[in-house]
Amino acid sequence: WIVEPCAMMNRRSAICLALGGLAGIQGCRKREDGAAKTDAVISPAGSEPPARKDMEGNSLVPVTVDPEQVIRTIGGLRPFRSSGFVVRRDELGGKTLVHNYGHGGGGITLSWGSAHLAVEMAGEVSGKECAVVGGGVMGLSTARLLQLHGAKVTIYTSDLPPNTTSNVAGAQWWPFSVFDDNRRTDAFAQQYVAAAKYSYEYFQRLGGPRWGVKWLPNYYLSQGPPKNGWIAGPGGVLRDLQVGLHDFGPGEHVFPAPYARRFHTMMIEPSVYLAELLAEVQAAGARVEIRKFVDGN
């Protein structure tokens, strides 16, 4: 049951219930005698009738939330930049250096698209030696695309999966919490949209248990009618990536908020996905050196 403050552009202005396949519905709690009580929906007064079968979300099974089932608590710091991620080419000491960092809450989501921008910016790489700094999702994705362009790749990293920040990502495919809307430039907007669309298409090739990628409905809950922004909803630049977009009003769904917006997208299991990506990169001939870089030299 994942409930967090969320909106398409302002995560604090509404309630977001993500991961439709794990949606939590009020009314699954323990009795005092230890027996489970499974009434469909319980209102504060306890008088609300069970949900109708035709209501959106009625087929979802509530998860069991029990502190005794928690095996560990972990966290990862998102590399958020209010002006958005950076993909930029520099020349340093006779070498070409391409920056690719700062993806906030959209690292796995944007990984293939942002890596594609970086590889395109690098120019012709076929037959050349290329170094990639970082062994998380962005480094591995960039390494793989470089290989597909004919490069010989060495990855320099202090950690590899499963010990990267990417491994603790939620990895729901949707590029949110990547930038502040009031800092968005036209140049960044172009990169953002291009990266999102490329990545969306690439991930669809990886669906299935081997890569740990599957489709799930996502539900965004709010106290008022769902708001549309620059990214999402009718008129949004990524509207075409919201498969099955539909809004539900009071009485049309089972969730504990007046309004719900649903769309289908991919869910990526980081532990499965990153292990497979690392294996593929290494099988294609990449060298890996465990090493830390302390400065730009």
Report the location of each language-model feature.
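N-terminal secretory signal peptides and thylakoid transit peptides that target proteins
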Residues: 6-21
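N-terminal Rossmann-like FAD-binding beta1-loop-alpha1 element of flavoenzymes
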Residues: 130-151
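Glycine-rich FAD pyrophosphate-binding loop
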Residues: 149-165
